[in-house]
Amino acid sequence: MGDLPGLVRLSIALRIQPNDGPVFYKVDGQRFGQNRTIKLLTGSSYKVEVKIKPSTLQVENISIGGVLVPLELKSKEPDGDRVVYTGTYDTEGVTPTKSGERQPIQITMPFTDIGTFETVWQVKFYNYHKRDHCQWGSPFSVIEYECKPNETRSLMWVNKESFL
């Protein structure tokens, strides 16, 4: 086991396929558990891109709402301070969220040697045939996290979450 990094910075990007289209969110205020809702389309594929700093960290998969997404090492950035992984998240078979409701979905990413990153996204899954609803709101390119691994190397505390 190597040294425990003081801070881990990671970003998760989602792009709807096949055209690498943007994913949207809307600000719901305090009506639900979280103030932001990510809008996803059922029956669709999303490219997942995870960037991690420091570049010595390794992951093999990310679980999005219980769906295991294998991650493949894509590259280390030229300056060598971040590593990039990609995978595909498929919403085939996911039930659309009822009108006026939101779904909390668990996000977990186990890191080799330093513990598991965990967070919850508030999501609304839209029926594939109502895809125009999925494009209202604000597009985001990435969700960035600043995390601190705990001393037992079991999990990471999320200090900050930013939609960019």
Swiss-Prot record:
<comment type="similarity">
    <text>Belongs to the CNRIP family.</text>
</comment>
<dbReference type="GO" id="GO:0098978">
    <property type="term" value="C:glutamatergic synapse"/>
</dbReference>
<dbReference type="GO" id="GO:2000272">
    <property type="term" value="P:negative regulation of signaling receptor activity"/>
</dbReference>
<dbReference type="InterPro" id="IPR029204">
    <property type="entry name" value="CNRIP1"/>
</dbReference>
<protein>
    <recommendedName>
        <fullName>CB1 cannabinoid receptor-interacting protein 1</fullName>
    </recommendedName>
</protein>
<dbReference type="GO" id="GO:0005886">
    <property type="term" value="C:plasma membrane"/>
</dbReference>
<dbReference type="Pfam" id="PF15043">
    <property type="entry name" value="CNRIP1"/>
</dbReference>
<dbReference type="GO" id="GO:0031718">
    <property type="term" value="F:type 1 cannabinoid receptor binding"/>
</dbReference>
<dbReference type="GO" id="GO:0010469">
    <property type="term" value="P:regulation of signaling receptor activity"/>
</dbReference>
<comment type="subunit">
    <text>Interacts with the cannabinoid receptor CNR1 (via C-terminus). Does not interact with cannabinoid receptor CNR2.</text>
</comment>
<dbReference type="GO" id="GO:0005737">
    <property type="term" value="C:cytoplasm"/>
</dbReference>
<dbReference type="GO" id="GO:0150036">
    <property type="term" value="P:regulation of trans-synaptic signaling by endocannabinoid, modulating synaptic transmission"/>
</dbReference>
<dbReference type="GO" id="GO:0098982">
    <property type="term" value="C:GABA-ergic synapse"/>
</dbReference>
<dbReference type="GO" id="GO:0098793">
    <property type="term" value="C:presynapse"/>
</dbReference>
